[in-house]
């Protein structure tokens, strides 16, 4: 029996067909009766009792067929009731396996998870969801589309695409003019004896807005992801940003491809460094990383991070352990970027800053990758996820440096540095997480947002790495539609000094008489909230956010009468609209 849609043509045709068959049976019986009643050439007329017997037999046949029709009608009604019940439970439950709002640029952990309700096309006829046929593709982007629901992703060929991004408006206030736009330059807070230390600032910014896309697919059992993300913190030559147009410049943040088959995973492109603490596994997806929940686009002092090109290979022995190795873009960094102070070079090697060592030259596009590097930075990492409430990762990094004596080209100087990072992210009680991230290095200070140099140069041209470390201790709590957070973090930069060739002039970092821009430590206390005001998987979400930030920095050397430290206060407020979209489960 082939039943079609409830209330459709198939259900109406079946009773009609049955009635037609019953009528044909009745007519056939009547024809038989008539034939029996007609006399043959050699027969005599049938007696009256014989005709009565035929009539009774016809009545009995009609009664039996009537019972059969009633039984069939009752069966149809029962099947109709079962279909109605099934459609009722389907329309009130969740459709799909998506988590709704959440896979949005780099704020996935910020947005509270919203369930995805059924999203059906208006239709007077309820249609059951088509069942997957035997041997149907496992790739949801190749499966037949569900004509009842509006999917939270786009289909292009055999891949799924979602937009990722949000639009931000961020008013912010600082009690000192850091001249650093929206992000904090942790290492260059003005001192109170400087003009900028006595001038406050208030600005509006949309620079943190982001646009991008994510592509998912499955080819012969290999699940691949392509991810792209831009913000508007790029640099440009125009000078009318605050005068007439506010023409901020897009900047590439992320652009990578990841492929996984079985236990092996491979990633290539520009991504967050594998040294960034994770929330889950060793995934490069922004929502699986920990870089705090703050509004400050430079995040928090002490976070180990960078976004740079590289390659990585991951091995998943099981669902609870991941091991990875990566080769990422190296840099012979001696300070001078993002508010970090540069080292003092020996006189004979002062030219290295513009030819062989990076003293902030790699900040602008004109000199991007202008500084040579002998090898990539190599990173190894292992992550443990025994359950959804606990994540632990341990990472190690190797850095390599090489210079040439500009007056004696046959003389080379090399040095190897490294560091270790330990991160813990634990949900101690429901909706309350404690976070700890700790880093110690000897020649990897660049990964602390450039606040520490990697190395110094001695008078003879030899290289010496600089100790640098950091810590982050924080808490994150979710109360209904609001995320609350608070962090303490800090950076320590070790002293590494030497004498110049004259034997009296000090060089390096943190020496007696060094500029007060050469910091010994930077500390931060910050807290804030992120509240989801409205969320709909078909339209996106609106969030309001707030953050307070207190920063302190202390130099290695304090001249007579000079301030021993400086600090500032910053208040951020943010209104965000997040684009809708989420990927199906593969």
Predicted regions and their residues:
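Bacterial N-terminal signal peptides that target proteins for export
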Residues: 2-15
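N-terminal periplasmic/intermembrane-space "pro-region" immediately following the signal or transit peptide
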Residues: 27-180
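Solvent-exposed loop segments that connect transmembrane elements
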Residues: 90, 97, 106-124, 181-198, ...
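Outer membrane beta-barrel
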Residues: 128, 143, 148-188, 193-341, ...
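Detector for outer-membrane/organellar transmembrane beta-barrel domains
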Residues: 384-527
């Amino acid at each position: 029996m082939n039943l079609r849609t409830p209330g459709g043509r198939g259900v109406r045709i079946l009773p009609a067909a049955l009635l037609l068959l019953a009528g044909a049976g009745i007519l056939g019986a009547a024809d038989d009766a008539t034939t029996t009643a007609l006399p043959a050439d050699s027969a005599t007329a049938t007696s009256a009792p014989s005709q009565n017997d035929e009539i009774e037999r016809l009545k009995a046949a009609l009664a039996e067929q009537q019972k059969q029709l009633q039984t069939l009608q009752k069966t149809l009604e029962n099947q109709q009731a079962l279909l109605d019940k099934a459609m009722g439970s389907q329309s009130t439950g969740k459709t799909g396996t998506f988590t709704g709002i959440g896979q949005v640029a780099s704020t996935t952990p910020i947005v509270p998870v919203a369930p995805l309700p059924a999203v059906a096309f208006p239709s007077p006829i309820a249609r059951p969801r088509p069942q997957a046929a035997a041997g149907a593709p496992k790739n949801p982007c190749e499966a037949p589309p569900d004509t009842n629901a509006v999917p939270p992703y786009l289909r292009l060929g055999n891949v799924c695409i979602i937009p990722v991004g949000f639009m931000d408006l961020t008013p912010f206030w600082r009690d000192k003019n850091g001249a650093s736009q929206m992000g904090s330059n942790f290492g260059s807070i003005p001192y109170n004896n400087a003009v900028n230390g006595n001038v406050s600032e208030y600005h509006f910014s949309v620079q943190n807005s982001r646009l991008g896309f994510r592509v998912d697919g499955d080819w012969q059992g290999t699940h691949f992801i392509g991810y792209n993300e831009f913000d508007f913190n790029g640099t440009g030559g125009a000078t009318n940003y605050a005068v007439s147009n506010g023409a901020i410049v897009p900047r590439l943040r992320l652009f990578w491809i990841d492929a996984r088959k079985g236990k092996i995973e491979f990633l290539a492109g520009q991504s967050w460094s594998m040294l960034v603490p994770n929330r889950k596994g060793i995934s490069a997806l922004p929502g699986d990383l920990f870089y705090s929940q703050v509004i400050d686009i430079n995040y928090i002092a002490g976070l180990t991070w960078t976004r740079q090109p590289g390659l990585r290979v991951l091995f998943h022995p099981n669902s609870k352990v991941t091991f990875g190795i990566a080769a990422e873009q190296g840099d012979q960094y001696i300070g001078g970027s993002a508010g970090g102070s540069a080292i003092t070079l020996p006189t004979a090697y002062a030219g290295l800053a513009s030819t062989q060592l990076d003293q902030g030259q790699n900040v602008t596009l004109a000199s991007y990758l202008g500084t040579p590097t002998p090898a990539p930075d190599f990173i190894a990492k292992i992550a443990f996820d025994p359950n959804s409430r606990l994540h632990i990762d341990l990472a190690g990094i190797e850095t390599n440096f090489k210079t040439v004596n500009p007056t004696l080209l046959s003389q080379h100087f090399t040095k190897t540095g490294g560091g270790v990072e330990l991160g813990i992210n634990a949900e101690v009680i429901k909706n309350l997480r404690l976070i700890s991230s700790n880093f110690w290095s000897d020649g990897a200070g660049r990964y602390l947002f450039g606040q520490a140099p990697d190395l110094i140069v001695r008078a003879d041209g030899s290289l010496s790495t600089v100790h640098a470390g950091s810590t982050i201790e924080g808490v994150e709590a979710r109360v209904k539609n609001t995320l609350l957070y608070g962090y303490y973090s800090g950076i320590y930069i070790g002293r590494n000094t030497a004498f110049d060739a004259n034997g009296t002039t000090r060089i390096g970092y943190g020496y007696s008489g060094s500029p007060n821009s050469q910091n010994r430590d930077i500390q931060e206390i910050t807290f804030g909230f992120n509240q989801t005001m409205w969320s709909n998987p078909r339209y996106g979400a609106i969030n309001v956010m707030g953050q307070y930030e207190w920063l302190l920095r202390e130099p290695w050397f304090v001249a007579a009468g000079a301030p021993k430290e400086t600090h500032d206060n910053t208040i951020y407020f943010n209104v965000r609209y997040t684009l809708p979209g989420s990927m199906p489960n593969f």
